[in-house]
Amino acid sequence: SYLSGESSSMQSFYLLAPTSWHKNPDGTWANSAAGQLAAQLTEGGDFVDEYNKFQTTFTLRSDIIPSLLSLNADYTFRSEKRNYDWDYKKYRIGYGPNDVRELGNTAVYRYRMDYDYQVLNLYASLNKQFQNHQFSGIIGYNQESYDFYRVNTSITDVISSSLPSISLALGSTNTSDSYTGWAVQGVFGRLNYIFKDKYIVEFNGRYDGSSRFPENDRFGFFPSASLGWRLDQESFFNVDAINVFKLRASYGTLGNQSVSDFGYIPSMSTYNNGYLVDNNRPLSISAPGMVSSNYTWEEVTSQNIGLDIELLESKLQFNLDLYTRDTEGMLTLGKELPSVLGTSEPNENAADLRTKGWEVAVNYRDNVNFLNDRLSFGARLTLADAQSEITSFDNPNQNLNQYYVGAQIGEIWGLTVDGFFESEEEITNSPDQSSMVPWGAIPTTVGSIKFADINGDGVITKGTTVADPGDMKVIGNSEARYRFGINLDFNYKGFDVQTFFQGIGKRDYYPFHYVFWGFHQQPYNGGFTHLLDYYRAADDSPEAMSQHSQKYIDMGLANANTDSRYPVLQAWNMDVNTYGAGSTPNDKYLLDASYLRWKNLTIGYRLPGEIIQSLGLSQVRVYLSGENLMEWSEISDIVDPEAVTNNGRGYVYPFQRRYSLGINVQF
């Protein structure tokens, strides 16, 4: 809402005080934070999002030598167009009886985006089998391109809110446009050999070029190889219960180009200066940032061993993979440069990363005779884990604000909390923690957080290096561990049910979040009931008790609370936007971000054949489906646990619960 000068985002609800009312007795919107926000959302304008997508795929196949050699081609074109239209209107606020005023501004904002994506694949495939030998191979060419165009225009002071048009406005106009795009071009090949259905060898190779890298460093070759051995086909393997027993191993390299489209080109931005020349703010151009000559593909080399087992007539399947993945030349900010340089470090192939992990999948499928009909059912469980560590980076001092050798990806450095201060004497005799005071101006008092002096120097400090971390240490890790998924399904007499659960078994999360801290962070933030569990040193006096409402007393707010979740009620005490206590993670408020979510449930029914055949149809299925139905997590009251990304705050709109009713008809 920057055009209208108002704030009407969903985020603003978090800042509302619980005492802010939204409507006056006469039904008009109140002149309060809640009233103005509600008026903006209901009367302050319209937003239309129009989205059109077109996609087509052409395929061509020619069997040059039937059952031996074929030529294939496919081309896909996808075009997406998106139009955003914002029309901002004034809204009415009741200041008193018969005193209704219009507030806000009028504005029109038009935003147009076009996406075009194209991919072309040309390849020849060869298949040949004789006696116990089977050969197959592919050689081909691949080309992809993506183009994005954007143009937006805005203008203020619309003459009539009933005619929201750019040409019917008197205010200042702001227009901008942008373009970005990328392209990939390469050749690829694969050769596969199988002997007696028990020895498997495969070789792969790609030679790819990306427009995201400089011309001289645009192409890279990425080979791989894999082996497989079906032990169950060997004469010495005689285990009736095991239908398949297969060992696998692979080694290969892939290229990663997940960087900005033109990151290798020095770019300059334009802006209007804050001073006037001839009554105009002059246009200025910023100095270009630095780019590095060491800027090309990340090379990701993977080593994998695996095991596949099938039991009970292949009803029960088990898959296990163990892998090590080395990323060489990871594209990230390079070595820290002197601050007097006046610009930040450029992205370059500056770091190496090693990831070790494993994946397990168990699948069971069967059908039984139940009440004279077949009941089929299945279950699948997947579980995976991985940890990543920096193995190379030019940071000899091991500064904590950059990668360093031995750093675990996602590690959280923080302070240790030693309870709350319980007396002024304890404050006086404790280590100096003034550097942790937000804004340097909020007094430490009874009920304030007490930090532990880990290094014993008598001062609570945040260090800067691994060797000198001050009173900080690694207290957790924000990376997701033990990702799991559970699929269940069954079919019986035309009914089918599928459900899916997913989750994360371990993840740490520090709440840099307004909902968690509320008025403990900033005095104008909103309040929630969990925030009332703050430190209170003693019961209120009888005189103070007599002035409290019964509700206040019943909630325990007049009683001592020394074993509280939050510190003493003190504005700015836990401000996360400063160098102080709130902005530095600590172990007391480190939360468990593991979760289990009921992701999907679908119940369907296929109409009997005699009914649909009489209608000239081949199949009719009706279904009811729900998504994001329920979740179990310690943090679900403040953020959506699935929306929490690595080192992210999770301060986004949560995943919505969706319900749908539909019908599938086949003719």
For every predicted segment, state its role.
Residues 92-93:
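Extracytoplasmic assembly/pore-lining segments of large envelope/extracellular complexes
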Residues 479-483, 490, 598:
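Short, well-structured alpha-helical interface segments that form or flank functional binding sites
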Residues 240, 327, 389, 457, ...:
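C-terminal beta-signal and adjacent terminal beta-strands/loops
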Residues 1-16, 20-24, 28-88, 99-416, ...:
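Extracellular/periplasmic, surface-exposed regions of secreted and cell-surface proteins
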Residues 475, 486-487:
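Long, compositionally biased low-complexity segments
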Residues 33, 463-464, 500:
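Short linear motifs in exposed loops
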Residues 348, 358, 367-478, 509, ...:
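Conserved small-residue
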